[in-house]
A protein has these predicted regions:
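N-terminal carbohydrate-binding accessory modules
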Residues: 72-126
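Aromatic-lined substrate-binding rim segments of carbohydrate-active enzymes
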Residues: 119-185, 207-227, 260-263
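Active-site clefts of carbohydrate-active enzymes
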Residues: 162-167, 271-307, 331-335
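Carbohydrate-binding surface patches
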Residues: 374-411
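C-terminal beta-strand-rich structural cap/linker in extracellular carbohydrate-active enzymes
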Residues: 427-447
């Protein structure tokens, strides 16, 4: 079992060698049963790996304390874990590979944000490549049934149920009101076959962290069968929210004012902010900012092109995303005066269909060879094994042509492209890429 604690030595002007740290494991009764030095202590993280089977079944607090060499305290942090004799069966949970498992099978959420569920639009959506949706308007039973009938899962929004916040329902004035409404939703839909996850946080500020953490604990108690998903624009503050979610997403919407490579930067940072221990379902842009602007400001916007949407989706996957929920389906209708829905929908489906085709690969947990990338920092790689084949994704996250060399440990016999330009083979295990701007390339390597 890996244990990690965030440190802020760099911000404090302290070097790692100037301090020491220790992890203490305590029972629910407060008895310390183990004290361990970290396996590694760096400027921003202390890590330890322990054998959980050494601990009797029960609840534990893990506390990390940081001190100077002379014994002066530099702070502490703690978390909880529950040691079980056997992992309980869950309808939906996140496994050790950060994949969502639904009814015992890996599931890659491929969906879009909705406003409210409307059956005529649902009919159109169900014919596309998507397997889930996240409607802001929390669905009723009839709408949940309609989604299930079409083979669609629902990420159910309870993100507004915080009294005193902007979008809280008018009658929600107290914590008791929040609890009553959440219990009601869990009772109504916790066992519904369409339910995939609970959407608990949509870009809430950091000063809400304590309330968000309490909400996470509540959802773990009320419905341990489904994970929670939070989405932030504060991509470089994710670490401060770690106690508030099971799954995290961030939502880079760069087009047209910023480079499409923001998708790569945000996903890399999101992954690293979680110590690469949490599932990441990213929220790439498919909408036109003009849907939210007027007059001259609206005229300055445009929708992302098919090339940009493809690149941003694969940038997210390459940097570690195990789910994609695009923003947004409902905005595709708002710009029909200059971008007909039919054309935009066709482009969105073409992009998502490419991801859907490779979902069996993206969900593989078979041990894959390590790869190293030499060249532009704008290139991200990720590798999977599926049977006797190795799949290597490499994405150029910049709007310029770049080159990079990827070295595959153990080498390979042949290479062919699933999409993108086939890289040049040069030496044992070496692939030399000449990327077009924003180009994603997926190759299949045979050993």
């Amino acid at each position: 079992m890996p244990v990690a604690a965030a440190t802020a030595l760099a911000e404090a002007g302290i070097q790692a060698q100037e301090v020491s740290g220790s992890f203490v494991f305590e029972t629910a009764a407060g008895k310390a049963v183990r004290t361990s030095k970290p396996d590694a202590l760096t400027r921003d993280c202390a890590t330890l790996r322990v054998n959980a089977s050494d601990f009797p079944v029960g609840d534990y607090t893990v506390r990390f304390a940081l001190a100077t060499r002379d014994g002066g305290s530099k702070g502490s942090a703690e978390t909880l874990f529950h040691r079980v004799a056997k992992l309980p069966e869950r309808k939906a949970f996140i496994d050790a590979h950060r994949r969502l498992i639904v009814d015992g099978k890996p599931f890659f959420p491929l969906g879009m944000y909705w406003s409210g569920v409307k059956e005529p639009e649902l009919e159109t959506y169900a014919k596309g490549p998507f397997n889930c949706l996240m409607p802001y308007g929390s669905p009723d039973k009839q709408q949940m049934d309609a989604c299930h009938a079409r083979g669609l899962k629902v990420i159910y929004s309870i993100k507004d149920f915080y009294s005193g916040t902007h979008w809280a329902p008018a009658g929600m004035k107290t914590e008791a009101d929040e609890l009553a409404e959440i219990k009601k939703r869990v009772e109504l839909f916790g066992n519904h076959p369409a339910l995939l996850a609970w959407y608990t946080n949509d870009e809430m500020p950091l000063n809400m962290a304590d309330r968000l953490a309490a909400r996470q604990r509540l959802m773990e108690e009320l419905d341990p069968d489904h994970p929670t998903w939070a989405v932030l624009y504060q991509y470089d503050q994710v670490r401060a929210y770690l106690s508030t979610f099971d799954v995290i997403g961030t939502d880079p919407y760069p087009i047209p004012e910023k480079p499409a490579g923001a998708a790569l930067l945000w996903t890399r940072t999101t992954r690293d902010q979680t110590y690469n221990t949490r599932a990441v379902w990213q929220v790439p842009q498919v909408f036109d900012w003009g849907a939210y602007r007027k007059g001259a400001e609206r005229d300055k916007t445009r929708a992302p092109t098919l090339q940009e949407m493809r690149s941003m989706a694969w940038q997210c996957v390459a940097a570690g995303a195990n789910g994609l929920v695009f923003y947004s389906f409902f905005d595709l209708f708002k710009m029909k005066d200059r971008d007909p829905f039919e054309k935009r929908w066709a482009d969105v489906c073409a992009m998502a269909e490419e991801v859907k085709r490779l979902i069996p690969v993206l969900l593989s947990a078979e041990p894959a060879p390590s790869v190293t990338c030499e060249g532009s920092a704008s290139v991200e790689t990720r590798v999977w094994r599926s049977g006797s084949d190795v799949y290597l994704l490499a994405v150029n996250g910049t709007s310029e042509a770049v080159t990079a060399t990827v070295v595959v440990a153990g080498g390979f016999k042949s290479v062919r492209a699933e999409f993108g330009n086939v890289p040049e083979r040069k030496g044992d295990g070496h692939l030399v890429y000449t990327f077009a701007p924003l180009e994603p390339v997926m190759v299949r390597l045979s050993e």
